[in-house]
């Protein structure tokens, strides 16, 4: 399934929301659920090992965090015995169990869902009698990395955000830069350093002050990996929109980047990385929107 087909399937959740939600609010449900399902699928293969490690370290009274990260093989984990499929086994307690499942994630992931204001949306879905149906819809979407690559997942997020921007009468340019444009920018950025970037073990940093969902950072990382699998590109970014920030942070975590490198806020007036220096920088400022300086 290509990213357009996958986006269309996820978008079909809107059929369940119609009547209870305004079109402009669909994104408040669909985006965080898409992130949740992706994280759920990423952790699936290491879930049992993480739970066993958590129990062992709890008995010993140790700080389990570094051990759990190692077992999860990611920069995040979940210590709840629940997962999205198990949520389907108890329709009467879907809200409480979903809250509990999200609380089982490590701190950086919980921050993502707080930025989405996801708990309020879960509560609203429960009151509307839609929570179980919506959750079930996402359980039927396989977003495992073996089926959907990080690159494809990034395109899915961008496509969903583009749809939401259209129905909200927002400017698409604030949310989306075509991938062919990004690839050209990345080629121009790296071309002078081709010989340096070809060296084994080379490490470089890159920064996007208007990161959006992280598309530019991701393409830069893909470029370097294609040209030198032994190179390491550490990514930094800042984003003003809380939903785009949350998606970017989730995407960076799944790629093995440090989620603390992604900051929320206006990079012109609230520079979250003012004391840092970077090897490269690229950006597409939101020219379609009014400047907020």
Model-derived features: positions:
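A mobile, often basic/glycine-rich helix-loop segment
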Residues: 293
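Non-catalytic, mostly N-terminal accessory regions of nucleic-acid modification and defense proteins
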Residues: 1-194, 261-272
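Conserved S-adenosyl-L-methionine
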Residues: 172-283, 288-290
């Amino acid at each position: 399934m290509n990213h357009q087909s996958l986006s269309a399937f996820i978008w079909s959740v809107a059929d369940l929301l119609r009547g209870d939600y305004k079109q402009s609010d669909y994104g408040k449900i669909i985006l965080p659920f898409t992130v949740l399902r992706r994280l759920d699928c990423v952790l699936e293969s290491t879930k049992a090992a993480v739970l066993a490690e958590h129990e062992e370290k709890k008995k010993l009274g140790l700080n389990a965090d570094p051990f759990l990260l190692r077992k999860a093989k990611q920069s995040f984990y979940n210590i709840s015995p629940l997962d999205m499929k198990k949520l389907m086994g108890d329709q009467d307690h879907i809200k409480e169990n979903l809250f509990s499942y999200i609380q089982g994630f490590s701190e950086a992931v919980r921050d993502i869902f707080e930025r989405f204001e996801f708990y309020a949306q879960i509560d609203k879905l429960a009151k509307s009698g839609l929570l179980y149906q919506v959750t079930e819809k996402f359980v039927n979407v396989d977003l495992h990395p073996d089926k959907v690559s990080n690159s494809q997942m990034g395109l899915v997020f961008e496509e969903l955000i583009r749809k939401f921007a259209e129905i909200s009468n927002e400017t698409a340019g604030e949310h989306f830069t075509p991938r062919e444009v990004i690839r050209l920018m990345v080629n121009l950025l790296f071309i002078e350093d081709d010989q340096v970037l070809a060296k084994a073990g080379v490490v470089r940093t890159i920064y996007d002050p208007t990161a959006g969902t992280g598309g530019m950072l991701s393409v830069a990382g893909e470029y370097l990996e294609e040209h030198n699998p032994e190179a390491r590109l550490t990514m930094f970014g800042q984003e003003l929109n809380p939903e785009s920030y949350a998606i970017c942070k989730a995407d960076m975590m799944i790629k093995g980047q440090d989620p603390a490198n992604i900051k929320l806020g206006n990079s012109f007036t609230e520079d979250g990385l003012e004391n840092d220096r970077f090897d490269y920088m690229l950006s597409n400022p939101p020219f379609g929107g009014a400047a907020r300086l």
